[in-house]
Amino acid sequence: MHSILAVDDSASMRKMVSFTLVGAGFKVVEAVDGQDAYEKAQAQHFDLVLTDQNMPRMDGLGLTRKLREHPKFKTTPILILTTESSDQMKQAGRQAGATGWLVKPFDPHRLIEVINKVIR
């Protein structure tokens, strides 16, 4: 069973994402922001990180950069799931090391499709 770290400062969004992922057969650990996610990622292995962009303490791009600094996370897929859809933000995501960029509101089937594509 693949494990996913789901990061979002919105409790309702975390629950919606977790419900979708667990329903598709994934193990999910939730984090409330980038700092919380970074600490959890240091403590255990995840097959994929799915993160919001705009969060307190550490945003999604900051988390992506920080994870990519460590060899342990060089190849871990990181998807950013956010309301931000500008080409400049997507480019910033690629430069930070994000594997992909998905826009909220999200289609649950599309989310699962993208995750399956990048981790299997």
Annotate each language-model stretch with its function.
Residues 106-115:
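C-terminal output helix
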Residues 15-23:
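Charged docking surfaces used in two-component/phosphorelay signaling
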Residues 52, 82:
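Active-site residues of response regulator receiver
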Residues 25-32, 40:
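Short hydrophobic/Thr-rich beta-strand motif most characteristic of the beta2 strand and flanking loop
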Residues 44-50:
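Active-site beta3 strand of CheY-like receiver
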Residues 55:
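Receiver (REC) domain active-site loop signature in two-component systems and cognate sites
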